[in-house]
Amino acid sequence: MDRFVWTSGLLEINETLVIQQRGVRVYDGEEKIKFDAGTLLLSTHRLIWRDQKNNECCMAIPLSQIVFIEEQAAGIGKSAKIVVHLHPAPSNKEPGPFQSSKNSYIRLSFKEHGQIEFYRRLSEEMTQRRWETVPVSQSLQTNKGPQPGRVRAVGIVGIERKLEEKRKETDKNISEAFEDLSKLMIKAKEMVELSKSIANKIKEKQGDVTEDETIRFKSYLLSMGIANPVTRETYGSGTQYHMQLAKQLAGILQAPLEERGGIMSLTEVYCLVNRARGMELLSPEDLVNACKMLEALKLPIRLRVFDSGVMVIELQTHKEEEMVASALETVSERGSLTSEEFAKLVGMSVLLAKERLLLAEKMGHLCRDDSVEGLRFYPNLFMTQN
């Protein structure tokens, strides 16, 4: 912790913000300290931590002070962490929260998730080392110059050499892991192509594809699930997470909506999406928050709330007038219908069937008879006859 210096939190000239994440706690090695809830910012030159309650409490550490970083998985009751190993503090270091520390590393605990994306971006900055190619103000340059304390300390060079060897070995292991991952991704691409081929067969129904085979194919496709579900671990718990989730929902729901007449209840959507996500289950709150962003992001589907409070997802092309006209035509052919009877005829849930009939009634095309036998809808003759 003695590597941190106090800062205003403002970016210097030529310094660019890369990513930020709320709900991050800082540990001095294994020790808990007072910096327990803040926003962690990564720039091209520094790691900056700002207290969420007191914005004047802001400290930073140059990326040039970092030796290497590693991930620490979450445990029972414990958040995932990023461990940052640091060079010794330079003798000309500016004032900070600690004058000295026995630890050569800090831990960053991500209470609100987002550590996967933050670790990836930090690793990229450590590889690119943009702080060397694009210098900023003199206040940051001081930490990159010669460090007299390190020259005088016997054995520091040997420790650094060992750390460098460990970093190279880690890089080698990561490279081998990515080679295996690349092979897996090639197989995944083959599976995607296969699923597209099956989907086209279902759509066109060419050859000898029977109705039973169609149902079986669809169940196979659904069981394959979502290849890369959006999670809090990847995008954190804020607006960015719900935006990415909304985009993924639009991708997986468009085809089922087209098959169901352009509209589905939010309950159906919840079951369908969680079945496809497998172990990465989605909470009802996150689903609603993501759906509220669909229209703002100009996606092909949208959230609609009926007067009764029932929430549905529908295609942007789904027109209310056509829906009401279809309901009126069906009721007129039968003389009168209950919501249960209407649901069987048009092949939708009773909940959605009732909402469609109520909408037609609201627009004056239907009228009701609410008796002990239940709610029954009739064509509104005042609208059709003189």
From Swiss-Prot:
GO biological process assignments: endosomal transport; endosome transport via multivesicular body sorting pathway; protein transport
Residue span, GLUE C-terminal domain: 105-138
Keyword Transcription recorded: yes
Pfam families associated with the record: EAP30, Vps36_ESCRT-II
Occurrences of domain GLUE N-terminal (ranges): 1-88
SUPFAM superfamilies documented for this protein: PH domain-like (SSF50729), Winged helix' DNA-binding domain (SSF46785)
Main subcellular localisation: cytoplasm
GO cellular component assignments: cytosol; ESCRT II complex; late endosome; late endosome membrane; lysosome; nucleus
Coiled coil start-end: 160-185
Cross-referenced InterPro entries: GLUE_dom, PH-like_dom_sf, Snf8/Vps36, Vps36, WH-like_DNA-bd_sf, WH_DNA-bd_sf
Keywords: Coiled coil, Cytoplasm, Endosome, Lipid-binding, Membrane, Nucleus, Protein transport, Transcription, Transcription regulation, Transport
Domain notes: The GLUE domain (GRAM-like ubiquitin-binding in EAP45) mediates binding to ubiquitin and phosphoinosides.
Protein name: Vacuolar protein-sorting-associated protein 36
Gene name of the encoded protein: Vps36
